């Protein structure tokens, strides 16, 4: 491990570090170097430019690497994957901060050897196979913006938007290799309303357009959260209530309609709506 950094009088500060590693499991052996770097330029607090490079390695779990088959029911099976390799994420981010509140950014993220469990309908027998596998990579390129605003003293709001281009590729997925691409938009709107000096109301909304996860298609999803806080007894006591996912819509509908596969995953569980007081 090595690390260097410096703060310059010109308003530039930077740091660079790196970690070397040798990993061995079974027949898989690999030397790897994981760099980290950051650069900040702040001539004045009104205009700040931030650049960063990061890497992160994630190892598969023990049970995921066992040579075993477990049965959910008479149709669905979970396969272990001996020799499952660790995944490595590389991310590059650039942010421009204006007046210490408006943020505009761009990013690139690539996860090499991404391991993920995906369903596959066997072409040899009547069986649904769930298996954790190493994909070639997942990759995202995107733009983001954070814009806060205020109306008087009673309404604070913040709008966040992320537009990204996703690509998922696996050349060794049973007999069904895939290389899928999708534009995805995410929007979040946070609002705080100060009704009077003792009563505050919060409202949050989130939305994501249809997305992909390997061979899966994820439909549009959205959530609405709300909360209220009352301060009384001379600001010595507070009563608050919050309801998350009011319309119970945070879990996306997931379908598989790729390469002759036909599957609809129906989410059956406790409601995602929660009320806390």
Model regions and ranges:
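Membrane-embedded beta-strand positions of outer-membrane beta-barrel proteins
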Residues: 16-18, 51-53, 104-106, 145, ...
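Surface-exposed extracellular loop regions of Gram-negative outer-membrane beta-barrel proteins
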Residues: 1-40, 45-90, 106-129, 156-165, 186-210, 246-261
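C-terminal beta-barrel architecture of Gram-negative outer-membrane proteins
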Residues: 163, 168, 185-231, 244-247, ...
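Transmembrane beta-strands of outer-membrane beta-barrel pores
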Residues: 18-26, 53-59, 69, 100, ...
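Repeated loop/turn-to-beta-strand initiation elements of outer-membrane beta-barrel proteins
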Residues: 10-14, 46-49, 100-104, 153-157, ...
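Single conserved hydrophobic/aromatic residue that forms the stacking wall/gate
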Residues: 266-277
């Amino acid at each position: 491990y090595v690390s260097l950094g410096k703060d310059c009088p010109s308003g530039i500060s930077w740091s660079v570090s790196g970690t070397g590693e040798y990993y061995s499991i079974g027949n898989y052996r690999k030397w790897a170097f994981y760099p980290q770097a950051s650069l900040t330029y702040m001539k004045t607090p009104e205009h700040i430019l931030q650049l960063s490079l990061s890497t992160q390695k994630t190892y598969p779990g023990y049970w995921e690497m066992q040579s075993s088959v477990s049965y959910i029911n008479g149709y669905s099976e979970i396969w272990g994957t001996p020799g499952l390799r660790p995944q490595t994420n590389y991310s590059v981010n650039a942010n421009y901060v204006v007046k210490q509140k408006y943020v505009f950014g761009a990013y690139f993220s690539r996860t090499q050897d991404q391991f993920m469990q995906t369903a596959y309908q066997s072409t040899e027998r009547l069986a649904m196979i769930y298996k954790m596998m190493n994909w070639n990579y997942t990759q995202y390129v995107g733009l983001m913006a954070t814009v806060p605003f205020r109306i008087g003293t009673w309404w604070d709001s913040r709008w966040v938007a992320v537009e990204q281009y996703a690509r998922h590729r696996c050349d060794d997925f049973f007999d069904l290799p895939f290389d899928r691409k999708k534009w995805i938009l995410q929007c979040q709107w946070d609002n705080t309303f100060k009704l009077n000096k003792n009563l505050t109301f919060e409202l949050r909304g989130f939305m994501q357009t249809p997305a992909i996860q390997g061979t899966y298609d994820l439909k549009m999803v959205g959530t609405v959260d709300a909360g209220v806080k009352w301060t009384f007894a001379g600001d010595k006591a507070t009563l608050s209530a919050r309801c998350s996912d009011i319309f119970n819509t945070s879990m996306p509908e997931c379908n598989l309609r790729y390469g002759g596969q036909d599957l609809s995953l129906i989410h059956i569980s406790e409601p995602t709506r929660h009320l806390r007081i």
